[in-house]
């Protein structure tokens, strides 16, 4: 496994602050606000990072083109979520890193017209950065903020 990036303590502190628009509220409030933003912006693609966010979107008939999950919520294992993806890709990505395997899988998924679910053995949090970096312009990258 080739580690391309490793999280430093300095960057860990910076990443505690949300990137982009923070939508606060209950699940129902945030999904309503997000739906309103989607309707207004007419984004070409939605990318979800995290099991809870991905499940909430799909439960509300919002289907991400790419979902990145690790089958964990708050570091506790959960039953895998059915996201209706056309393709599922498994990658390794230890906590606090970004691996070449994960980076390449995200790039390929975003080049595809299929709905892709990337299941991470390790941790998916930092992969949000790769999704933002490689997403088509005006895409929505949606992730949970503890």
Residue ranges, per PLM feature:
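Active-site helix-to-loop segments that bind/position phosphate- or nucleotide-bearing substrates
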Residues: 2
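Conserved mixed alpha/beta catalytic, RNA-binding, or beta-rich assembly cores of soluble enzyme
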Residues: 5, 9-146
């Amino acid at each position: 496994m080739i580690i391309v990036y490793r999280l430093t303590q300095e960057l860990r502190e910076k990443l505690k602050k949300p990137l982009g628009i923070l939508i606060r509220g209950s699940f129902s409030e945030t999904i309503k606000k997000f739906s309103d933003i989607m309707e207004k912006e007419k984004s070409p693609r939605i990318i979800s990072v995290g099991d809870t966010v991905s499940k909430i979107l799909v439960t509300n008939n919002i289907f991400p083109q790419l979902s990145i999950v690790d089958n964990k919520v708050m570091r506790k294992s959960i039953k895998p979520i059915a996201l209706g993806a056309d393709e599922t890709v498994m990658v390794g990505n230890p906590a606090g890193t970004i691996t070449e395997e994960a980076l390449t899988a995200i790039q390929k998924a975003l080049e595809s017209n299929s709905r892709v679910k990337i299941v991470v053995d390790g941790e998916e949090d930092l992969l949000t950065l790769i999704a933002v970096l490689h997403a088509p312009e005006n895409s929505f990258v949606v992730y949970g903020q503890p």
